């Protein structure tokens, strides 16, 4: 079984565990924790609205409860959290782990990348539907306020995206306590409804859900679209494993989040059983009138926190994809020294903002947005289940039957939700699916194009022996300086070094040929960071290893090398990097031509290598060359 975090061995009295569990409430459970704002309301509307029958109410809430149990508690909390890639979770980390150890690499990578692309697709909807559903509580406070809902939601979203570059480390410390208060509040409100109509507790029996599902034909099938909304944030349970570890996530779930959600959904169902109107948001009707405005404010803050988690997750996943070679280099800004996860990627932030605002304005209400929400994340969960099956069989060494039975249960549930959500395609579900296809295509095109360039560059490499022989024959002068040449191959001499000697007829007496090696693990062990070997007189070949959660910083790396006794002066280094100009010529096939043109566009707009590796501009020498693809 793959290793798990040491924190898992701590007991409940451990103050570190309690602190991490509190933090997990603010980051991990924001999305799933704000789902009661719109889930039960959507389910009742899909069931026909109006005054629903008792079996409809009981069946609906029973399906919600058991979806939370099967998907969130069993699939993600019990199984997925135990399959980590050196402590990291999420579909890209799982893809990297499996592709590193198994032979089914193309299939695993295709499934993993599609799952990641789908997360981006639904990630544009989550902030919109969450904030809208919270602000819509104003309509219950006063019907005349409904005209202000959309402008307020847009203002909140713009502000949220605008402050990302400043970092959220300071206010982020309050996320955990705020979400803890949120879960306590919704749990108490729900318990209040259950006390008024305790017979609703019978819905915990799964027979109610199954009976409603199979005895109501198309209606029973369609409401699965609404039921699924209760677990749209479940993928975050796995993705945030690296931030907190297994034990805090489990502790926060079973200790507060899960019981609070169950009580709230039961409370909403109890309220409808009592005859409450379903025209307005049922969630807010649980609240006594005097406390409605504070609840609306708390709901808005909770949805902002949920949206922040989505945005931060998008930044983190983008960095992973870049380090694994599936996206071009983008500028990554560390917004806080307190945590490596505190980063900002401007391009991702503004594109996400434009997409989210477009959806908010285009759909206008959480009820309409629910028609587009869920299809992409349900497909992501299918992808995760496929990889989970492979992990159970290949990594945990379970036999094929046991692995199939466990994963098969999840597959049936996931496939049912995905099939139901496909009915949303025309009504808006095509939007996240289209976005996912675009992102997947970009990742595939970038990776294939980058591989093509790497192959063409290696063709120009020469051996160390040939290079040393040539500089001796040509009597190349060695000057007392240090030069670093970046390369994509570990052993040979890169073309930029050959060009440098050919044009300048001099060579520094200390030459480091450096390859940056991106690993399929989150972080490289300090002892494995750098391997360096002298392959010729004053010529060293070095390989620097970085995990997909790490950002290469070459000057800091070389400073450590200098501290270890190597005769280099960090202040007197010249960095030589290749600057490729890619062009397309004589492509007859139209599709192939446009694919190559897209790659050229991405390559030209990628962050320069010198910026990405934090090289001092005054010490960088770029050598240009043209490459035809």
Swiss-Prot record:
Gene Ontology terms for molecular function: potassium ion transmembrane transporter activity; symporter activity
Highest taxon in the source lineage: Bacteria
Principal subcellular localization: membrane
Keyword Cell membrane in record: yes
Subcellular location per the Swiss-Prot or TrEMBL entry: Cell inner membrane
Alphabetized Pfam families for the sequence: K_trans, K_trans_C
One term under GO cellular component: plasma membrane
Alphabetical UniProt keywords: Cell inner membrane, Cell membrane, Ion transport, Membrane, Potassium, Potassium transport, Symport, Transmembrane, Transmembrane helix, Transport
Reactions this protein catalyses: K(+)(in) + H(+)(in) = K(+)(out) + H(+)(out)
Bilayer topology term: Multi-pass membrane protein
InterPro entries cross-referenced by the UniProt entry: K+_transporter, K_trans_C, K_trans_N, Kup
Residues spanning the membrane: 20-40, 61-81, 106-126, 143-163, 171-191, 209-229, 253-273, 291-311, 343-363, 372-392, 400-420, 425-445
Function text: Transport of potassium into the cell. Likely operates as a K(+):H(+) symporter.
UniProt record similarity statement: Belongs to the HAK/KUP transporter (TC 2.A.72) family.
Database matches in PANTHER family: K+ POTASSIUM TRANSPORTER, OSMOTIC STRESS POTASSIUM TRANSPORTER
Name this protein carries in UniProt: Probable potassium transport system protein Kup 3
Organism listed in the record: Legionella pneumophila subsp. pneumophila (strain Philadelphia 1 / ATCC 33152 / DSM 7513)
Name of the coding gene: kup3
